[in-house]
Amino acid sequence: MRRRRPRRRALAGEAGLPRYTPRIALRSIDGHLTRTAHQVMAWYRLAGQAWSFRSDSQRETLIRQIAAQLGELQGRWLHLRVTTRPYPVHRWAEAFDKNAVDRLPDVAGALSWDAFLEGEQRHLMGLSMADKEVFLGVEVSGRSMLDRWAERVAPILGKVAPAAARAELEALSSEVAHLDSIVAGPGLDAVPASAEDIAWLMYRSVALGLPAPRTLTGFGPGPARWDAEDLAAFTEGVHLYQEPYAPTVQVIGRLRSQTVRRHVAVLTVGLMEGLYIPEVDDPWMQHSDRLPFPVEWSARMYIRRPEEVTGELQRQMGKVRSQIRHYTHDHDLDPPAALARQAERVLEIEDELTTGLTQLNTRLYGWWRIAVSGRDEAEAIARAQQVLELYRPKVRIEHPEAQYRYAREFIPGEPLASTAYRRRGSVLWAAAAVPAATASVGDRRGIMLGETCTATRRPVAWDPWLAQEVRRASGLTAIVGGLGSGKSFLTGLIVYKTLRAGARWTVLDPSGPLAQLTRLPELAPFSRHINLLRAEPGILNPYRVVAEPRLEHFADEEDPERAWRRERSLAAATRRRLVLDVLTGLLPYDVARLPHTRIVLLRAVREVGGAPDRHPGMVIDALRRHAREGEEHAGVVADFLAERRELPQAALLFPDTSREDPWVGDRDYRLTVLTMQGMTLPRPGSPREEWTDAEGLAVELLNLASWLTQRTIYDSDRNLRKGVALDETHFLSQVPTGKVLIDRLARDSRKFNVRALFASQLAGDLLRVSGFASLVNAVFVGRTDDEEAQAEALRLLKVPTGVGYEAMLGTLSPRPREDEGPDDTPRQFIFADGHGGVEKIRVDLEAPHLEHLRRALDTNPNATRAAARSSSSDAARALSSGSGSADAGALPADGPAGDAGASAHPAADERVELLDDEELDLVDDLDTPDDTRDELEVVQQVRVPREAAR
């Protein structure tokens, strides 16, 4: 008898598990492919396209390129999504901090690097700016019954036959590769969407209108595949519902453990008049970028095949012809203008049909939806009304019912809510929307300059050394603009922020406002201010301002010593030419223009040579020797030069031979500001013969000061980030050696890692230098009113002329007419970054942590400041006379002035040097009583920067 086996208890297994079905049509995401029950779509991210400051031919080329790519997608459905992503402030801060090589040490009591970087981030986050992101979904293939069955049993099939589970995607691989190549061409410039892109698109579509989460803005490399159960990460916690007949749909979701509610109004594009893009109108999808709130777009398009279009077009042409005959034959009337335009279009279409429908005249139809959100229904409706007003009168924007279904259209894979408001046209018409048109200028690792102020608002960061270190380009930069356009303000901003990040700067500012940078507490220990008109004799010796080449700078040459000797010879020749120009400029015009004058000067200069230990006095001595040898004119020239030598400012050319080079300091200063306050320069554009003796000397001193500025380039390590800033450079273009200086800086800026800023009122002065336009890298153009100057500025920007951009330069930095206060509005510039980006930007220095910098760079005169100083001085004198004490002016041993210099510089002798060119305030020498200390505190802060520094 057979024994029965004991019965085993059955395990629960997987049969009892509930099946999860997503609340959206999407069923899986695999790489950049999304799958629904009936369709597979490939998603791509479109590159931003520059539109501003392009010629009409360049814009038409872009439109035709996009149209040709759309024409290649015949027979396919497309889903276009335009969304926004908050500007990645933390990523910029990390890149900026990493790029700040050899930055300045922190100074006790001053703005530290961490505080500076935190302030930049907080200010940038407060501006709430975002990047526009454009995604395009392209239908790959429909799904068969077998494909849907394989997806349903994928968990089991993946264990039994893994290859069968992947068969659908492998079968589509060649078609996907073909689509990748089509959309990657110029025009769309699309790349397959990454996992981060897909995740962001899904969240922004499912949670339409909700604030962007900070956690997803830095979404790292995510999973390549999302199954149906994984899609719950996007849908759970987000709910859409609409009250009956409500004009908006409510979106409720969780954001950082808080419930957030938004009202979303979905609009649709209706009838559209003829738009003339690019001759008159801008791309119609770009209009929404001008609004001060985010706008979402969703467009569903079907690219029609030629055989589907031909019959329909012929029927439409027949209707138009019948209507024309009805007016002209039946009633003997002229047809309406709109009907006449349709008749012209009929002739064009008939020609297209007879020649065959090409890619550029392929037809399509589609639906364009717009979504705006608000905290409540009233705000959402108000924003929707702004969209309607923005597009009037040429484009009608409709506000349909069934907002819930229209809102779901934004989610990839969802079906159309309605076929109402279908728009038909050619691919050229659809391409003229240019959805990816945006403002693109600068980079994402440099200092923050401000923001774009065109149709698209974006932060503008710029690394002045990216061109030299990465892109192997020159570091030449032009800053052009009329009086009050903000050139000095922009220069000071660039110098300050890059100095904090580790650069070394030498600034020549003849008028002197940028010298205030050396008094800022965080910069003072590393800065020096030299007023050249009060400096040591010989600081502008023409033989010393030209740097002597160093052998280590030629280590990468094939024959370093030979290259070094060649450069030494060139430096000596430059010194001789510079001395010749300077001494000729010191002579009266009638004497200098005589041919014999140049001959005798050239002979004397050649005799003295070009060694760096020479000085112009030796040239005068040589002229006198030649006079004694019978050269009478040499004596005349020597007498004139000796007379000029007696002028106070001429002593800068003739060194005291008992001293060392006055330029060489005892420390490596990070910032050196050279000023020439009190120097009288000639009127710009005035001929040489009208210059006075003082003006002629001033031009030569300015030329020598510019050469002295560039000397720092060659005195330090060539790999260090260095910068030179030169103001009043329009005079350099009038002096031969000034042109040589500009050309030399342009050519050596890459090799020696230099950013050279040339500021001038007129672009023509810089264009006068041969090759400047081809060597310049970045350009800033401020407000310019003269028509000729505007055209020259556009040439410098490499922007097409004669197409209407000239007038825009006269509208920069507008000021309200009714405003009677000081014009402290942020200045605007046209910024060309040297790498193809050209945009109008607004310089931003409104951050609270930079308030002291804004005050230091404020060059606007203010009579109230002088009145405050005058009244404070009167009060000080009254206190001094009333005390009757003989030692009232004595400075206390532990008084504030005793600490001021110590906080700025570590050595006592350096404190004395910094105070040489400052006006001492008698108020600081008082032992101020307690009851008047508060009254005088403001004056002390304004007039004694060392006290403020402490």
Predicted segments, located by residue:
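An aromatic-glycine-centered, glycine-rich loop/turn in mixed alpha/beta architecture
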Residues: 1-27, 40, 57-68, 74-75, ...
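Nucleic acid-processing catalytic cores of prokaryotic defense/repair systems
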Residues: 27, 34-96
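P-loop NTPase motor domains
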Residues: 56-74, 308, 407-422, 427-459, ...
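Switch/coupling segment of Walker-type NTPase motor domains
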Residues: 81-110, 125, 489, 493-603
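Surface-exposed, low-hydrophobicity interaction/linker segments
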Residues: 98-108, 273-360
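Conserved P-loop NTPase motor cores
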Residues: 327-328, 458, 465-485, 490-497, ...
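Conserved P-loop NTPase
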Residues: 803-860
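D/E-rich low-complexity acidic segments and tails
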Residues: 883-938
